[in-house]
Amino acid sequence: VRHVDASGKDQTRSQMRFQRNAEEHAKHHLKKVVAALKDLDKTVPFDRLILGGPSRTVAELERLLSEPLRHRVVSAVTLPVEADRKTVLEETLRVDEEFEHRTEMSLTEALLTAAAKNRMATAGVAGTVRAALEGRVRTLVYPRDFAVFAKDCPTVPANGGGGMPLTEFLGEPIKPEDNLLDLLVENTAREGAKVEVLHGEAGLRLKEAADGLGAFLRY
């Protein structure tokens, strides 16, 4: 008669079952997160998604996302499971600000490059105002604290010659000290065009390179 000690094998099998159960529970939870994101997108549509958590969990979550949701992921942040709400919010805001900065800098450089090559873009107050008056603006771009006063904004005839101070703008009488930006933005929106407001470094870059105003054009 031989006596076989199976306690070690039993313990190993028990650990394996526990591990499988834990993994299945985690995957079930991640699927619930994905379902919640889909429901949220239906009620409150969003265009960017930041994932946070332990790196392995984040990777698995991203793998489970549908293609449309995966394309909206702008960053993944490694956070411990026990991270509190304040830590999560701070990291989310930091990542979002970095994303905004990169996006706005990229937009600004693309605008300046296209304008320099005369490829469906213009940079500078006179050219942008002229494009707005002609209904050619596709996307208006300016810094958050920007102002364009009538006294500093000449009309530029189509033949490119001369220029006089504006006394009327988009059918509205104006004074030399009036800020035209509100009228410009309203007209842009009315024409079905987009408006992009720059912050921080991107806004400074546009001010230095193009007096703070530019636009991508329809034609």
Write out the residue ranges for each language-model feature.
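Terminal alpha-helical anchor/extension segments at protein ends
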Residues: 1-219
